[in-house]
């Protein structure tokens, strides 16, 4: 008896760019053999706004409000890196109190970033309840930001070359301590709901496994790298701001799958709480901004000393000039390494301003880790990467 052979042709399916699980306007062109993923091609650029060119036509103070629109979950990190680059190029020291305030804002943003990752990721794999819980905690972080900067989510416009825009208001540190005391048990609540939940573990354990060598070769960073057995955290490696003053550990796992990335982010929130508590207790007094960086140092032969500028009301704003030279600086955001390559030519605007977004690099490994998985696993693996398309496309 002859047996008929069944042949299936590969099928090409479009995911996005308007699919609710796409985490933004990301389009995936997926080739399927039945239920199995054969190939995947990410299509990006739908949210490109020319941020680097905007930076090259703005002074630093003018550009700081723009940057939090790139990654609305990590606005403080982008504000920090945008002012760190000219600071290091011009060797401008930052007062100790300002550095502590920066750390407080960055660690609050790290917790907010991980919370905004946690809710949609769990919704992607079928757990709806934690999605509503995370906004309860984020609301308290919004209140802290609003008290210090005037804005809640983005456009905080708080970081400045040489420090921060304003000191913390009276009672802010006590409110931050209250948040730390309140949020610690909430992480335990998440772990009780999620971490050892057998349905959750069977759903994502073993998915999207990335080996240690692959993570390094693909230039991954942040939880994507640390979940694959590489304890690399720029807060420990580069010793920027005042992180060396605090006692905390790098969160990392060895398995390299979606579950390991979840464990890393949960532990990072605990470590951020430790840093916040220590910063609230140890913050010194003193100025919050190096005002010398704002001084207009033009010299006698400059137009600023001429008749027109002095007597015809054409007052020159105290704009910092970026000195000649080039420099790359980086910091550890909630998603990984974000960096800026800046090239100055003794002008108020940079000649070149290149932004390295962490999730842009992390997204590139997606086709590599999707091959061989089922079509239903695409959303779980993509969700574990933590992408915001504003910073991917820039």
Curated annotation (Swiss-Prot):
- Quaternary context: NDH-1 can be composed of about 15 different subunits; different subcomplexes with different compositions have been identified which probably have different functions.
**Might you name a Gene Ontology BP term for this protein?**
photosynthesis, light reaction
Mind telling me what this protein is named? NAD(P)H-quinone oxidoreductase subunit H
What is catalyzed by this enzyme? a plastoquinone + NADH + (n+1) H(+)(in) = a plastoquinol + NAD(+) + n H(+)(out); a plastoquinone + NADPH + (n+1) H(+)(in) = a plastoquinol + NADP(+) + n H(+)(out)
Q: How does it sit in the membrane?
A: Peripheral membrane protein
Record-level Gene Ontology MF annotations: NAD binding; oxidoreductase activity, acting on NAD(P)H, quinone or similar compound as acceptor; quinone binding
Q: What is its main location?
A: membrane
What InterPro entries has UniProt attached to this entry?
A: NADH_Q_OxRdtase_suD (IPR001135), NADH_UbQ_OxRdtase_49kDa_CS (IPR014029), NDH1_su_D/H (IPR022885), NiFe-Hase_large (IPR029014)
Localisation per UniProt entry: Cellular thylakoid membrane
Q: Which organism is it from?
A: Synechococcus sp. (strain CC9605)
What UniProt keywords are attached to this protein's entry? Answer: Membrane, NAD, NADP, Plastoquinone, Quinone, Thylakoid, Translocase, Transport
**Pfam families, from UniProt?**
Complex1_49kDa
Cited Gene3D superfamilies:
Cytochrome-c3 Hydrogenase, chain B
Q: SUPFAM superfamilies in the record, alphabetically?
A: HydB/Nqo4-like
> Which function does this protein serve?
NDH-1 shuttles electrons from an unknown electron donor, via FMN and iron-sulfur (Fe-S) centers, to quinones in the respiratory and/or the photosynthetic chain. The immediate electron acceptor for the enzyme in this species is believed to be plastoquinone. Couples the redox reaction to proton translocation, and thus conserves the redox energy in a proton gradient. Cyanobacterial NDH-1 also plays a role in inorganic carbon-concentration.
What phylogenetic lineage does the species belong to? Bacteria, Bacillati, Cyanobacteriota, Cyanophyceae, Synechococcales
Q: Mind telling me which GO cellular component terms the entry cites? A: plasma membrane-derived thylakoid membrane
Enzymatic class: translocase
PANTHER family given for it?
NADH DEHYDROGENASE [UBIQUINONE] IRON-SULFUR PROTEIN 2, MITOCHONDRIAL, NADH-UBIQUINONE OXIDOREDUCTASE 49 KDA SUBUNIT
Q: What family does this belong to? A: Belongs to the complex I 49 kDa subunit family.
- EC number(s) per entry: 7.1.1.-
The record ties this protein, via PROSITE patterns, to: COMPLEX1_49K
């Amino acid at each position: 008896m002859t047996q008929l052979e069944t042949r299936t042709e590969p099928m090409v399916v479009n995911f996005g760019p308007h699919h609710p699980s796409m985490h933004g306007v990301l389009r995936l062109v997926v080739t399927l053999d039945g239920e199995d993923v054969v190939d995947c091609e990410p299509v990006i650029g739908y949210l490109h706004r020319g941020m680097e060119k905007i930076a090259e036509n703005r002074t630093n103070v003018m550009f700081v409000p723009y940057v939090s629109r790139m990654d609305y979950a990590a606005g403080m990190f982008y504000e920090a890196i945008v002012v760190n680059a000219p600071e290091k190029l011009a060797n401008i020291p930052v007062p100790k109190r300002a550095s502590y305030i920066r750390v407080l804002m960055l660690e609050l943003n790290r917790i907010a970033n991980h919370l905004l990752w946690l809710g949609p990721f769990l919704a992607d794999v079928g757990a709806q309840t934690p999605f509503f819980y995370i906004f309860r905690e984020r609301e308290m972080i919004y209140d802290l930001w609003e008290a210090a900067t005037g804005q809640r989510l983005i456009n905080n416009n708080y970081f400045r070359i040489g420090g921060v825009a304003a000191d913390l208001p009276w009672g802010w540190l006590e409110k931050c301590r209250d948040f730390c005391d309140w949020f610690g048990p909430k992480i335990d609540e998440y772990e009780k709901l999620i971490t050892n939940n057998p349905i959750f573990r069977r759903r994502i354990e073993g998915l999207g496994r990335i080996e240690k060598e692959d993570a390094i070769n693909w230039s991954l960073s942040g939880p994507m790298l640390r979940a694959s057995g590489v304890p690399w955290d720029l807060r420990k490696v580069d010793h920027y701001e005042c992180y060396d003053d605090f006692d905390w550990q790098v969160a990392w796992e060895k398995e390299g799958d979606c579950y390991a990335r979840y464990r890393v982010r949960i532990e990072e929130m605990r470590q951020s709480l430790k840093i916040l508590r220590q910063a609230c207790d140890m913050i010194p007094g003193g100025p919050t901004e190096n005002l010398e960086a704002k001084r207009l140092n033009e010299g006698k032969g400059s137009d600023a000393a001429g008749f027109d500028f002095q007597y015809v009301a054409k007052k020159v704003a105290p704009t910092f000039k970026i000195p000649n030279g080039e420099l790359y600086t980086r910091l550890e955001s909630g998603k990984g390494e974000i960096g800026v390559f800046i090239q100055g030519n003794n002008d108020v605007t940079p000649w070149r301003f290149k932004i390295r977004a962490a999730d842009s690099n992390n997204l590139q490994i997606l086709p590599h880790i999707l091959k061989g998985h089922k079509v239903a696993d695409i959303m779980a693996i993509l969700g574990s990467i933590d992408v915001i398309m504003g910073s991917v496309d820039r």
